[in-house]
């Protein structure tokens, strides 16, 4: 995969994302550039300045029109500071800004990462504490963030509102150019020593002991959590081995505690200046306005130091082997705890054509079940899944191509490199099938047509990555020039094979192996304790006694607490803000029409799609038996893996690439907008293609669903392979979105609807998959029973029953043709009803449920769920306002700023009827749960100001009015039955919410509500069992879990 770079940043409260995809690996990661409606005047050459023109202190250096992307790029330089500036003019209302700085990390203390956090904690023009988070509810931005990469840091935002753009631009520029970088912000965001709960200091009356002191800090805890992700750990240790010149920019907890505030300030002075910056703006807003505002800030600076150093990886002049220890994966057999990969260099990213070609080569070798590397390394059983570094990494100047697998035994580990080299040699001799190459080129054609809402953000991210490593951004944007150059070389014959010969057919490579070690986590704990004792010993010597050292730490903690509490009542009038009055009361209407084809309901959304048709079908199953529900995700995997009697999966993958932009199947679960507890579940099928290829797309989908051969001799082995793919790395998947898993597990205790969803997409599904794998590997009879159940699902998966519904998005001119195609498709479907079972009674007798998942993480993830009301209820909108108010005015300051968690927040799921509290990478879950518990009284008793109410409403409309990709239009009505009128009414209710309304719903649902369920994920401590938690485990061990997987009661 063309892996970008690792993003570590100040995110909003982590969003509740969809379950991690059960995909083999990302498909060819070629940046998906989308077309706009027409080549509008905003991106025409005539409306923009010419080379040599001077505007607001900038001089135009270069100008280029890119017709295939419907944009014009202008490169400028600031006359006084020589700051680089790139403007991308395009008819796109979602405008984007980004400023980046070269920040080569001098060590592994995480100074670029901690600087990224503290930079946004206050500036000269906006001297309040943390203007970044304070701006979140004062803006209609659909994206605000900051990212630390391996060698640069960037600060992007996106918004459709011009005043909002100017407001955010002012805040971002002042933050990056004039940061305050106060020591208390460094202590809060970076690291410090202090008592776990600062508020308990006063009550302990001098009884604070050295053992009560621990390392704290937002970034420190973030990186402890990051290091608990074995995939990240493998990737970063690999980077440290092949790229020692680039230190760990995120920070290693073992070294973060060596960083001082003085070093942070010096690093900022050295790197955060206009001469060392690169700036990008994108969209349809006037360039002159941007230059005037940006130039007004940059003109205060003189030309400064520029870090032009481009770090390079180690030289590979022969084989190098590196082996490091890592954590045990409890979802993998004890005798398969090795992860190993081999890496080569592939040229220079400044050669855009060769780098693009290397990406195609990587995809041909790795993408899909039919790829040669998948067959040799995973299908063979040698390993379970690809390593995190597998693919082409173009984040540095030298592209690095890696291939590796996890879940390998110690005896087989040396064979991995041998197999990789064997496959490379055989592929070189055999050459590449032209049909496969044409398939990838067809995918590029569709990517150019596909209209996405976040095109600008994608351009900025990719441009910064290569620009900071010496690539020409104008060449990067010239998409057709690159593709045409590739085609020209490819058509001469032997080009890709020559590329392989040049870079991969040699032994100039690094083999990196991580070995699962039982003592790994304990050794980390011991090292942290030793570091703490050393720091404490230094403090004791400094202050003369242990007691004085403890007293001084407590005093410093109370001082920080005082600063944090004062900030909660600070005057924010210096910050710019939009007004609620600026928001239209009318929701933009994107009408759909409905029809019936052969008795099947069809929802049509006719819109400009650049000649593409997007297809989505759902088949709903009523009262599906619990044992079959658990198998729906595996069924979806299987039909995209096993092949049919007429074609292997490799042949199907080639056809999919040649005829479509992709097809997929997945399980779906939606709740009623009008009735609590009512839900619909089943399977959904989707894909998109050129209008002329819609018949082929539907034929492919239908064949895969109905004809997949579960009886072939290879089917049992492939089923086990799929189970291993899912279980391998399951703990890392949970660590990445632990708050979401915790919330889903908590909600499962509230209703059968949430329980059913947990069975297919939560921790229960992960454990069920591990159980299936264990049974499949130990009992041929159990495996045969499993396959029979999958065949049963296949018989009714897609059928002409009352549960089948279809949505199409296409051009109006394509509707008639598509209707004829649909008619033929529906007519040819079988008519098989799904089996049913009597739903078990859901136990509502327990008002509060507590589940604790004992997992090997160094921080915690929590979720607390409360049932509320349907979407159409009058309290739904008020609950959403309440969630915003609690997040920004209570949970963020209490749990993140004071408690040190990376993220915390409240959310209202208006369609699900669920109010939720979550924390993410949290060192102090006991305190967090107390804060959750006190939230109701806090919200009920607070006299909410008009400003706070209005900011909460703005926060809701950030998501409500965010741009939507064309393929998503109409899906809300199609899946959930939410009409435009329902959305309009809910919108008006949000705008009309009062402070009194908020107080009342807080009383009703948070204070008086008796039904709630909570879940914690993390390392079990003694208090878990003493406080009434039901302790559970996730494991391959048959006795390692007591998760109820098939019992709704």
UniProtKB/Swiss-Prot annotation:
Which keywords annotate this record? Hydrolase, Metal-binding, Metalloprotease, Mitochondrion, Protease, Transit peptide, Zinc
- Where does it localize? Mitochondrion intermembrane space; Mitochondrion matrix
Matching SMART domains: M16C_associated (SM01264)
Record-listed E.C. numbers: 3.4.24.-
Cite a single GO MF annotation: zinc ion binding
Alphabetically, which GO biological process terms does the record hold?
cellular response to farnesol; mitochondrial protein processing; protein processing; proteolysis involved in protein catabolic process
| InterPro entries to which the protein is assigned, alphabetical | Metalloenz_LuxS/M16, Pept_M16_N, Peptidase_M16_C, Peptidase_M16C_assoc, PreP_C
| Keyword Repeat attributed | no
> Is Protease one of the keywords?
yes
Active site at 116, 189
Query: Which residues belong to the transit peptide?
Result: 1-39
What domain of life is recorded for the organism? Eukaryota
UniProt remark on cofactor binding: Binds 1 zinc ion per subunit.
Cellular component terms (Gene Ontology): mitochondrial intermembrane space; mitochondrial matrix
Under PANTHER family, the record lists: PRESEQUENCE PROTEASE, PRESEQUENCE PROTEASE, MITOCHONDRIAL
Family that this chain belongs to:
Belongs to the peptidase M16 family. PreP subfamily.
- Tell me, in a sentence or two, what this protein's role is: Degrades mitochondrial transit peptides after their cleavage in the intermembrane space or in the matrix, and presequence peptides; clearance of these peptides is required to keep the presequence processing machinery running. Preferentially cleaves the N-terminal side of paired basic amino acid residues. Also degrades other unstructured peptides. May function as an ATP-dependent peptidase as opposed to a metalloendopeptidase.
Listed under subunit, the entry gives:
Monomer and homodimer; homodimerization is induced by binding of the substrate.
Q: Kindly provide the name given to this protein in its UniProt entry.
A: Presequence protease, mitochondrial
- Taxonomy-wise, where does this protein's organism fall, top ranks first? Eukaryota, Fungi, Dikarya, Ascomycota, Pezizomycotina
Query: Which gene is transcribed and translated to give this protein?
Result: cym1
């Amino acid at each position: 995969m063309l892996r970008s770079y690792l993003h570590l940043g100040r995110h909003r409260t982590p969003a509740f994302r969809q379950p991690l995809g059960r995909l083999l690996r990302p498909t060819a990661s070629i940046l998906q550039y989308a077309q706009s409606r027409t080549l509008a005047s905003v991106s025409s050459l005539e409306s923009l300045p010419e080379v040599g023109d001077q505007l607001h202190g900038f001089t135009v250096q270069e100008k280029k029109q890119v017709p295939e992307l419907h944009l014009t790029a202008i490169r400028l330089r600031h006359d006084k500071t020589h700051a680089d500036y790139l403007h991308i003019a395009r008819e796109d209302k979602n405008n984007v800004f980004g400023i980046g700085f070269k920040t080569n990390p001098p060590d592994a203390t995480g100074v670029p990462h901690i600087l990224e956090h503290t930079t946004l904690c206050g500036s000269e023009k906006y001297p309040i504490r943390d203007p970044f988070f304070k701006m979140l509810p004062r803006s209609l931005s659909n994206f605000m963030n900051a990212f630390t990469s391996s060698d640069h840091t960037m600060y992007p935002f996106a918004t459709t509102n011009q005043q909002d753009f100017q407001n955010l631009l002012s805040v971002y520029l002042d933050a990056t150019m004039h940061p305050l970088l106060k020591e208390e912000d460094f202590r809060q965001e970076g690291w410090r020593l202090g008592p776990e709960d600062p508020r308990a200091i006063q009550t302990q009356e001098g009884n604070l002991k050295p053992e009560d002191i621990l390392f704290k800090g937002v970034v420190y805890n973030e990186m402890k959590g990051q290091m608990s992700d074995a995939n990240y750990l493998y990737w970063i240790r690999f980077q440290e081995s092949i790229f020692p010149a680039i230190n760990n920019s995120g920070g290693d907890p073992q070294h973060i505690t060596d960083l001082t505030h003085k070093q942070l300030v010096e690093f900022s002075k050295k790197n955060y200046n206009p001469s060392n910056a690169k700036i990008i703006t994108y969209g349809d807003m006037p360039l002159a306005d941007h230059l005037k505002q940006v130039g007004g800030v940059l003109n205060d600076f003189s030309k400064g130091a520029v870090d032009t150093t481009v770090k390079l990886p180690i030289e590979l002049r022969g084989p190098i082997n590196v082996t490091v220890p890592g954590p045990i994966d409890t979802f993998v057999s004890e005798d398969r705890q090795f992860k190993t990969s081999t890496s080569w260099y592939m040229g220079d990213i400044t050669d855009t054509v060769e780098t693009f070609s290397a990406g195609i080569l990587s995809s041909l070798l790795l993408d899909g079940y039919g790829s040669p590397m998948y067959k040799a390394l995973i299908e063979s059983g040698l390993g379970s899944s690809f390593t995190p570094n597998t693919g082409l990494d173009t984040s540095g100047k030298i592209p690095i191509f890696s291939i590796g697998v996890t879940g390998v035994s110690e005896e087989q580990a040396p064979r991995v490199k041998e197999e990789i080299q064997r496959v490379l040699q055989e592929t070189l001799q055999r050459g590449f099938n032209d049909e496969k190459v044409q398939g990838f080129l067809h995918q590029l054609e569709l990517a150019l047509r596909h209209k996405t809402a976040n095109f600008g953000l994608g351009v900025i991210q990719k441009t910064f990555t290569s620009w900071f490593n010496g690539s020409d951004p104008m060449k990067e944007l010239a998409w057709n020039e690159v593709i045409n150059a590739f085609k020209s070389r490819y058509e001469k014959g032997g080009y890709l094979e020559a590329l392989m010969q040049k870079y991969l057919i040699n032994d100039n490579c690094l083999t990196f192996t991580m070995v699962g070690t039982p003592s790994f986590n304990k050794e980390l704990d011991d090292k942290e304790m030793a570091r703490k004792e050393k720091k404490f010993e230094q403090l004791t010597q400094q202050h003369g006694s242990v007691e004085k050292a403890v007293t001084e730490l407590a005093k410093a903690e109370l001082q920080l607490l005082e600063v944090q509490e004062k900030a909660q009542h600070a005057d924010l009038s210096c910050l710019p803000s939009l007004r609620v009055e600026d928001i239209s009361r009318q929701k933009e209407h994107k009408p759909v029409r409905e029809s019936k084809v052969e008795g099947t309901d069809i929802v049509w959304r006719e819109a400009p799609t650049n000649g593409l048709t997007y297809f989505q079908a759902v088949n709903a199953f009523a009262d599906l038996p619990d044992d079959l529900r658990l198998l729906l995700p595996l069924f979806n995997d299987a039909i995209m893996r096993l092949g049919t009697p007429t074609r292997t999966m490799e042949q199907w993958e080639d056809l999919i690439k040649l005829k479509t932009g992709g097809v997929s199947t997945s399980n779906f679960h939606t709740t009623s907008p009008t009735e609590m507890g009512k839900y619909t579940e089943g399977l959904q099928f989707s894909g998109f293609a050129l209008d002329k290829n819609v018949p082929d797309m539907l034929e492919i989908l239908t064949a895969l669903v109905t004809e997949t051969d579960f009886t072939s001799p290879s089917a049992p082995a492939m089923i086990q392979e799929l189970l291993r793919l899912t279980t391998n790395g399951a703990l890392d998947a949970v660590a990445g979105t632990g708050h979401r898993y915790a919330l889903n597990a908590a909600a499962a205790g509230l209703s059968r609807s949430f329980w059913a969803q947990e069975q297919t997409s939560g921790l229960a599904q992960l454990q069920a998959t591990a159980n299936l794998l264990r049974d499949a590997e130990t009992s041929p009879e159990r495996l045969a029973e499993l396959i029979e159940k999958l065949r049963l699902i296949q018989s009714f998966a897609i059928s002409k029953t009352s549960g089948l519904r279809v949505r199409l998005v296409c051009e109006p001119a394509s509707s008639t043709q598509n209707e004829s195609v649909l008619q033929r498709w529906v007519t040819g479907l079988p008519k098989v009803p799904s089996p049913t079972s009597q739903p078990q009674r859901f136990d509502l007798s327990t008002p509060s449920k507590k589940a604790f998942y004992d997992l090997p993480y160094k921080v915690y993830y929590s979720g607390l769920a409360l049932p509320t009301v349907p979407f159409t209820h009058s309290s739904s909108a008020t609950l959403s306002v309440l969630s915003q108010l609690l997040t920004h005015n209570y949970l963020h300051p209490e749990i993140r700023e004071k408690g040190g968690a990376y993220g915390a927040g409240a959310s209202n799921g208006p369609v699900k009827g669920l109010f939720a509290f979550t924390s993410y990478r949290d060192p102090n879950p006991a305190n967090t749960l107390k804060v959750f518990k006190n939230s109701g009284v806090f919200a009920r008793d607070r006299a909410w100001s008009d400003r706070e109410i209005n900011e909460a409403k703005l926060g809701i409309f950030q998501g409500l009015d965010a741009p939507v990709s064309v393929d998503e239009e109409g899906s809300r009505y199609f899946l959930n039955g939410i009409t435009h009128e329902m959305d309009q009414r809910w919108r008006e209710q949000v705008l009309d919410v009062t402070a009194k309304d908020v107080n009342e719903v807080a009383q009703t649902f948070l204070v008086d509500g008796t039904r709630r369920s909570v879940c914690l994920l993390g390392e079990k401590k003694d208090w878990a069992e003493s406080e009434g938690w039901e302790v559970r485990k996730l494991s391959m061990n048959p006795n390692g879990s007591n998760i109820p997987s098939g019992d709704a009661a």
